Regions:
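Acidic/polar active-site rim loop that often engages polyanionic ligands
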Residues: 103-109
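Basic, Lys/Arg-enriched alpha-helical interface segments
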Residues: 1-87, 109-126
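Short, surface-exposed charged micro-motifs
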Residues: 89-91
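Active-site beta-strand-loop-beta-strand hairpin of nuclease catalytic cores
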Residues: 93-102
């Protein structure tokens, strides 16, 4: 089944622009849906704070390759934040130092993103 989606601008920074996938049948973008799953005060607060700190750093310095954990096949650009050990992963596609497209993410529930239920939106893109 093909899902219809758009890519919307989330934030503009001098060094990088953040975009997010937005499935047509959903009210929120995938990035917004990620943060909705982990409200302030939840069990994963520390992990969310780590991801936010990385987003701030990337916003300031750009989407440099060294800031990402590569999760996909060679050359597909699928990456995750944070690069360090964490219970959560926020998945994205790094197109360049200046363009970052976020998908969704969640609790690290398997060894490979292709096996994760939370990453189906990335796997099913046409």
């Amino acid at each position: 089944m093909t899902q219809l989606y758009s890519i919307e601008l989330i934030e503009e920074h001098e060094a990088v622009n953040f975009y997010s996938l937005h499935l047509d049948e959903k009210e929120l973008s995938e990035l917004e849906r990620f943060f909705e799953k982990f409200p302030e005060g939840c069990y994963f607060d520390e992990d969310v704070d780590t991801i936010i700190a990385w987003l701030d750093r990337i916003g300031e310095l750009g989407a440099l390759e060294r800031y990402f954990r590569y999760e996909g096949r060679y050359g597909d650009g699928v990456s995750a934040i944070p690069i360090e050990t964490s219970n959560l992963r926020l998945y994205c596609i790094r197109l360049s130092d200046k363009i970052l497209v976020f998908g969704n993410g969640g609790v690290k529930d398997c060894a490979r993103w292709q096996e994760s239920e939370t990453c189906l939106v990335l796997k099913n893109l046409d």
